[in-house]
């Protein structure tokens, strides 16, 4: 494409994946991470997560207000690091997950985000239908609370049998859930991630076309999921070019082609398109981020006008 990617997409970084020290919300150096991203004008958006220290959180909010970045809030770590499950068939467990996600909405508002993203929890075949109803209950309650603040709620589509083993996807089930949600909640949407698509045995074209009416947010990254004995197998979001990875420049280009053909390049109101990349073992986070930019730059250069 001759035109800049920034005309059509808000390129973002999931800060707590690229710099995972804050995954549990307790990184004392979180302001340094946020400043690093805010000072890099490659990025139009930043995705943040919980910051448990109230004083640090207020300083972060001030920094983000100054940055002119689109701020997004990922509530997934609140569930993944605590074992809470938004579709828990035990009502007490479901309510505990809902409570932390309600707190996430408040925190997102303070940080300047216009909503939160979360994921469905683990499931069992014998209680799958009940878990689905529990997830509807949680999500409807979140949407009602967010609606009063003019905020949105997004559910990220994950794998169902490899790593996170989440109730939602694959794509057809995600579409059913989103349709059920949209009957009562117009502030609900779906987030898709290129790194999860190989893990649900689907293609970008199939996923985007199946979920098209409901998609509000995009992630892009890599995964190792073809060989269970391979280093880094599972939902680890390795850098592009990682041995055994499913996604690289070719797959990012295919993803962009599908988004373009399906009308997701919107110059008036661009969608967030964020890198979800994570250092593997002792890799340097800054180099991993540079790798992601380089990969996207090449894919964009190859994309036909």
Question: Model-predicted segments: where are they?
Answer:
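Alpha-helical scaffolding segments of alpha/beta enzyme cores, especially the outer helices
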Residues: 32, 36, 55-66, 99-106, ...
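A short, acidic, amphipathic alpha-helical segment used as a generic capping/interface helix at domain edges
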Residues: 202, 244-266
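Acidic-and-aromatic substrate-binding clefts and catalytic sites of carbohydrate-active enzymes
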Residues: 20-26, 45-60, 124-126, 133, ...
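Active-site clefts of carbohydrate-active enzymes
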Residues: 233-240, 268-286
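Acidic/histidine-rich catalytic cores of soluble enzymes
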Residues: 146-242
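Hydrophobic faces of well-ordered beta-strands that scaffold small-molecule active sites
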Residues: 7-16, 44-48, 69-76, 116-118, ...
């Amino acid at each position: 494409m001759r035109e800049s990617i920034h005309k059509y997409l808000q390129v973002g970084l999931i800060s707590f994946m690229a710099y995972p020290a804050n995954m549990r919300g307790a990184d004392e150096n979180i302001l340094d991470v946020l400043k690093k991203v805010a000072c890099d004008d490659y990025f139009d958006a930043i995705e943040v997560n919980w910051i448990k220290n109230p004083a640090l959180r207020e300083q972060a909010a001030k920094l983000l207000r100054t940055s002119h970045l689109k701020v997004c809030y990922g509530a997934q770590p609140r569930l993944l690091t605590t074992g809470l499950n938004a579709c828990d068939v035990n009502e007490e467990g479901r309510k505990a997950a809902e409570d932390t996600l309600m707190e996430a909405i408040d925190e997102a508002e303070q940080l300047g985000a216009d909503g939160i993203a979360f994921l469905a929890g683990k499931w069992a075949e014998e209680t799958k239908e009940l878990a689905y109803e529990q997830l509807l209950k949680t999500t409807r309650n979140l949407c009602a609370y967010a609606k009063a603040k003019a905020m949105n709620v997004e559910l990220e589509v994950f794998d169902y049998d490899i790593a996170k083993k989440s109730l939602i996807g694959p794509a057809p089930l995600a579409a059913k859930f989103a349709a059920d949600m949209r009957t009562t909640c117009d502030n609900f949407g779906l987030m898709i991630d290129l790194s999860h698509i190989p893990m649900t045995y689907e293609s970008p074209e199939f996923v985007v076309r199946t979920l098209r009416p409901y998609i509000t947010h995009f992630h892009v990254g890599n995964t190792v999921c073809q060989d269970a004995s391979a280093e880094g197998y599972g939902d680890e979001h390795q850098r592009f070019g990682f041995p055994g990875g499913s996604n690289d420049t070719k797959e990012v280009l295919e993803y962009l082609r599908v988004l373009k053909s399906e009308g997701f390049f919107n110059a008036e109101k661009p969608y967030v398109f964020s890198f979800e990349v994570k250092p593997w073992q002792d890799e340097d986070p800054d180099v991993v981020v540079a790798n992601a930019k380089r990969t996207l730059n090449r894919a964009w250069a190859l994309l036909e006008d």
